[in-house]
UniProtKB/Swiss-Prot annotation:
PANTHER family: C2 DOMAIN-CONTAINING PROTEIN, C2 DOMAIN-CONTAINING PROTEIN 2. Residues 542-553 have a biased composition (Basic and acidic residues). Residues 245-362 form the C2 domain. It comes from Homo sapiens. Residues 51-242 form the SMP-LBD domain. CDD domains: C2_C21orf25-like (cd08678), SMP_C2CD2 (cd21682). It comes from the Eukaryota. It is found in: Membrane. The gene is C2CD2. Residues 539-580 are annotated as: Disordered. It is a single-pass membrane protein. InterPro entries: C2_dom, C2_domain_sf, C2CD2/C2CD2L, SMP_C2CD2L. The chain crosses the membrane at residues 13-33. This is C2 domain-containing protein 2.
Length: 696
């Protein structure tokens, strides 16, 4: 019994549990259905068209401002607006019939983003609307009153202008469509100025201006231009793959011609010929403006007076790219902005064929789109420069240079020793460069001469004999120095030694200085003037003069490894009747330096004090051919008689105040002594069989 009751209670409890679970399931399903029904019955929220109260969006403003600064946008949107205006004007019809063109003088515009709003059209498309403001925009408007009538050209300027831009972005699309519409605001000013205004158009200008303003505002407001920009993202790996593929293709293919952006266009020698004087009468200053459409580059020439024949020789270089299609040449009046345009010409560019090339002529018109009158012609020279092509400038041939050093030293006895050293530098010929003109070329290049004159220095020199010594200066100039044999020669040698110590920048080889003769000259004023002319002539001359060979040349020849031999020297030639002047020997033609040694124009008369320099013992110690290479010595008395109009030293003035008798007396005594010393020295050298050496 008990077991039966227990089984019935368990069955009832199980049944109650199953019923409870079923009721709970029904309640859950009912609650879900009720919520679904309520959700369906609830009204959906409306889509927001504009969000004015959200405040500024710096992120969106920066992004849109960056998009509006892209070169692809700047190069397309003005042309797209002009196309839309022409389509709207053609759809509207006329008269008047209007057509729009881009103004070549228009600079790149900066659009300022002011308000940004977002509108969600669908799940795959999003539209961003923004309000932008520009400073000013210009168009060229050609107006035809009736079909077949003459065209009139106007400048239309909107400042400032307001646009509403819409950016249409779609999912899974790689392009961005930008469309905009013109917003007419009260503060916008519309300026319309006719071009080439004649006297018969003055009365019609004000009447047509108001009519055109209304028409242009209506056309600008109804036109709907648009531009499509490609926005394809590229990863770093894709960019590297593209570069590798391009390099592989270039290795397998022959070298390609230079790209458009690597070319440069050179425009020069612009010649303008105007048929008549356009515009108002009067004197004007014409200027030529050359402008490239893309990338925008603008160059202006110098001012030219108002003449029918205008010429500009300036050179203008333009950077090119694949979008460089037109080059505008504008002749305008300086000082006037828009109404100063006199004539314009458009030059089409074909970068693939590199045309135009060379001198080309184009017609100058008023710039309107429909058949305007021809105002003249313009001729210019065009050339394309490839990368790596340098502008070829004429390189002048190397010019030999001659440096002349004049050094004066005053000895204690009053004798002035003047050393004139002439050094000619041959031009250096580098490997791979054009060689200079040779010596036997019919075209001779003048020698550049640099004269260096040092101040007078006073030196006390003892007259004692010493052996010959050899010195080597820092400039690799070999000097054979004779100490004490002759005070005058010693002074000259010391001057040459000091001048040779100047270190050269790039010494090539060893040079040798030869002093082949020493002579005293007593010159009058007439001979002074003659030597001055000879000094000038020797600087300008590039030819060598023939002269008899000197007997002492063999004893003082240069080393065989030297390519440049010694120059000639001075040799005294006393005359019986007139010993006041001593003739100077000319240089032999064998001198390899091909330059003349200059004479000292400041020769003096010898006075009686010259005996302190000349001693018989000194004259006996001369050795033939002591010194080496290219210097001539001229020495004189310190007291000289110059032209009173020339610069005089204190001693010169003292000498001029001396009486004539004392000077003649000193000259006579000097003649006698020099004559005796010269004959004695020559006789001794002849007996010993030595070559004759000039006596000092």
């Amino acid at each position: 019994m008990a077991m039966a009751r227990l089984g019935s209670w368990l069955g009832e409890a199980q049944w109650l549990a199953l019923v409870s679970l079923f009721v709970a399931a029904l309640a859950t399903v009912g609650l879900y259905l009720a919520q679904w029904a309520l959700a369906r019955a609830r009204p959906q929220p409306q889509r927001r068209a504009v969000e004015p109260g959200e405040g500024p969006r710096p992120g969106s403003d920066a992004l849109l401002s960056w998009i509006l600064t892209l070169g692809s946008w700047r190069s397309q949107w003005q042309a797209a607006w002009v196309t839309a205006l022409n389509e709207e004007a053609e759809r509207k019809g006329g008269p008047p019939f209007l057509s729009f063109e881009e103004d070549p003088r228009q600079q790149a515009l900066e659009l300022v983003v002011q308000e940004v709003s977002s509108v969600l059209r669908s799940a795959e498309e999003k539209v961003v609307v923004c309000h932008v403001v520009g400073q000013a925009i210009q168009f060229l408007v050609s107006e035809t009153p009736a079909l077949g009538a003459g065209c009139r050209l106007y400048d239309m300027r909107l400042s400032p202008f307001h646009l509403q831009l819409e950016f249409h972005m779609k999912e899974k699309r790689e392009d961005l469509q930008i469309s905009w519409s013109f917003i007419s605001v009260p503060e916008m000013a519309v300026n319309i100025q006719p071009k080439a205004l004649g006297e018969d158009q003055v009365a019609e200008t004000s009447a047509m201006s108001d009519v055109l303003k209304d028409i242009l505002k209506h056309l600008a407001g109804s036109a709907s231009p648009s531009v499509v920009l490609i926005t394809k993202p590229t990863t770093v790996k894709e960019a590297q793959n593209l570069q590798c593929a391009a390099s592989t293709a270039q290795e397998s293919c022959p070298p390609k011609p230079p790209r458009a952006h690597e070319l440069k266009l050179l425009v020069r020698n612009i010649h303008v010929l105007l048929l008549s004087e356009p515009g108002a009468s009067g004197h004007i200053n014409a200027v030529c403006v050359v402008q490239l459409n893309d990338p925008v580059q603008r160059f202006s020439s110098t001012l030219t007076k108002n003449t029918p024949d205008l010429m500009w020789e300036e050179e203008f270089t333009f950077e090119l790219n694949a979008k460089s299609k037109e080059l505008h040449l504008q002749i305008s009046e300086a000082g006037r902005s828009s109404e100063g345009l006199l004539a314009t010409a458009t030059v089409p560019l074909d970068l693939f064929k590199k045309q135009p090339s060379g001198p080309q002529s184009f017609t100058l018109t008023s710039g309107s789109a429909c058949g305007s009158s021809v105002l003249g012609s313009v001729t210019a020279e065009f050339s394309y420069m490839e990368p790596g092509e340098l502008k070829s400038w004429p390189i002048p041939p190397p010019v030999p240079a001659a440096k002349i050093e004049k050094d004066r030293t005053v000895m204690p006895c009053g004798t002035v020793v003047t050393t004139v050293t002439a050094v000619k530098t041959k031009p250096r010929v580098d490997v791979g460069r054009a060689s200079p003109l040779s010596s036997d070329s019919p075209v001779k290049t003048p020698i550049k001469v640099k004269v260096i004159e040092k101040d007078i220095s006073v030196q006390a020199i003892a007259c004692r004999s010493a052996p010959v010594s050899k010195t080597l200066s820092s400039s690799d100039t070999e000097l054979l120095v004779l100490n004490g044999s002759d005070p005058v020669a010693e002074v000259a040698i010391r001057q040459l030694s000091e001048s040779s110590k100047l270190k050269l920048k790039s010494p090539r080889k060893k040079s040798t200085i030869i002093i082949s003769g020493i002579s005293k000259t007593s010159l009058s004023q007439d001979h002074d003037a003659a030597l001055m002319q000879g000094y000038t002539a020797s600087v300008d001359s590039t030819h060598q003069e023939d002269a008899p060979s000197h007997p002492e040349r063999a004893a003082a020849s240069a080393p065989p490894e030297e390519a440049e031999s010694a120059q000639a020297s001075l040799a005294p030639k006393p005359q019986e009747d007139e010993l006041d002047s001593w003739d100077l020997e000319k240089e032999p033609q064998a001198a390899a330096w091909s330059s003349q040694v200059l004479l000292d124009p400041d020769g003096d008369e010898l006075s009686e004090s010259s005996m302190s320099v000349l001693e018989p013992g000194t004259a006996k110690k001369h050795k033939g051919g002591i010194l080496r290479k290219g210097a001539k010595l001229f020495f004189r008395r310190r007291h000289q008689q110059k032209d009173p109009g020339m610069s005089q030293s204190h001693n010169d003035l003292v000498f001029l105040e001396q009486p004539e008798g004392s000077r003649r007396k000193g000259i006579t005594l000097t003649r006698i002594l020099n004559k005796k010393l010269l004959s004695r020295h020559r006789n001794k050298n002849t007996m010993n069989g030595a070559p004759v050496e000039p006596c000092t």
